Amino acid sequence: MDYSTATTTAGNGYSSPRDSSFPSSFTKFNSALTAGLLNPMSPPPPPAMHDKTRSSPTLFEMMASEADTIGKVPVQIHNGVLPSPSSSSSSSSAAATAARTTNVNHLVISAQDKQALAMQRISDLLVIRSPGNQFNDPNSSDVKLTLSSKDGISITMCVHRQILVAHSRFFAMKLSDRWSKQQLPPSSSPYIVEISDCDDVEVYIETLMLMYCRDLRKKMMRHDVSRVLGILKVSAAIGFDAGVLSCLEYLEAAPWSEDEEYRIASLLSELHLENVGATEVLRRVSVEASNGNNGSNGGSNDEVLLNLLHIVLEGKDEKARRDMKTLVSKMLRENSSGNDLRKESLYLACDGCLHKLKRQFLQAAESDLENVDQIARQADNLHWILDILIDRQIAEDFIVMWASLSELSEVHSKVPVVHRFEISRVTARIFVGIGKGQILTPKEVRCLLLRNWLTPFYDDFGWMRRASKGLDRYLIEDGLSNTILTLPLAWQQEFFLAWFDRFLNSNEDCPNIQRGFEVWWRRAFWRRKEQSQEPARLRVTASATENS
């Protein structure tokens, strides 16, 4: 290449004259940098030794010259044969550059390199065919079909009018007798058909090859889901019904990834293939498709999820129960609509757990410790259901129900702490929910909750803190402080003074709500002082007005 007089404008906006004042290696490096083939942060190669001849060009020179040799014209394949080496040097060079830039410099493959690789795959696809297959056979074909894409790829292949017409409604119309008579080719000349703006020429060719295949199912098994989706789109576009059915049969039986699942549902919805088997495919991911229009098959989402809740609540293996609770909570949390599980169903499950808890707790209070482990189990179940209710913003009725359980709070001290402390974890979760504004209830309900359950909560706090793994003490203390601070000031005083006395006598076994106490103190005494001074200021203002 001649670098003697050209002026190149680099990507940064500066132009670099290429004259004799610059070493040839620098100008070639600058040309490669301008073409986007090198990392701009890489240092330039050292100046060339003019007195030393090289037998072969350097890597920098090859990459620099490549930018000018890659042509802009579309690459064409005729009958599965790539252009001659002299005319295809730029394409093969681009493929080599792709390998070098990917493996050596870790750069993104350019559009020209991708085109060259695609052309090579298409060439291999057209050349290789099973014995007896007449696809792309120039000796027996009567149609020259040219496919061209938007990115400049153009392929001409030899196909058979009889096969295309028999399998495709598009080609049946395109190659109809009326159209054939208008063409009137000589007996030795094939018909010429051109299809432009193909999305993917390679997929289009594979779809045409299926028309020549006797066992489409076996042929389809060689492809992955992504390629089958491409074939399905082309088959639907050209009216290749056998190809559409084969693709749908494959998709119905093959496993999908989550990304493929979205693409499949989107494409089937776009193509409207319900009458030819798409519904069978969608039944894997759509309840409506599985149930049909009448919805008679299978249960509703609410029934299924309620059944799952009961299975988890009554499971025998504790480790498996914990794992499944986490899983079910995650799935319910991901469904933001909340229409899958009715409020009544959740509270029905809650009532069942609460009934068992009350029965076992009252028995334990009378020194009947048979099945006493059910107290902790049912309290844990209620804690889990409460989390779900809070996530769905429907926990207000639970707070009313829990605050009214005076029959349990009154006998709380009669049950050994090792069996009862899980109940206080439910109370703690309520404090956190109210303190964060996740649960909004009337002040009378909040006050009743504290009157019935605050003392039992204090009694269990030390044991709960030591026995419960992962317990966030500071989160609970902050929630309790905020819960008390939501009450009228006179009620706040009652609860904070009771805490103050208890904290001084059992420091470690009592939650530290000093922050809330300080807020109440400022509210109570500072404002009283301000209010006592306010009438005097008003009187002074009034007298000053009269004197004026």
UniProtKB/Swiss-Prot annotation:
Pathway: Protein modification; protein ubiquitination. GO terms for biological process: protein ubiquitination. Residues 141-220 form the BTB domain. The keyword Cytoplasm does not apply. InterPro entries: BTB/POZ_dom, BTB/POZ_dom_prot, SKP1/BTB/POZ_sf. PROSITE patterns: BTB. Residues 15-25, 83-97 have a biased composition (Low complexity). The modification Phosphoserine is found at S130. Residues 1-14 have a biased composition (Polar residues). Residues 1-25, 77-97 are annotated as: Disordered. Keywords: Phosphoprotein, Ubl conjugation pathway. The BTB/POZ domain mediates the interaction with some component of ubiquitin ligase complexes. May act as a substrate-specific adapter of an E3 ubiquitin-protein ligase complex (CUL3-RBX1-BTB) which mediates the ubiquitination and subsequent proteasomal degradation of target proteins. This is BTB/POZ domain-containing protein At1g63850. The lineage of its organism: Eukaryota, Viridiplantae, Streptophyta, Embryophyta, Tracheophyta.
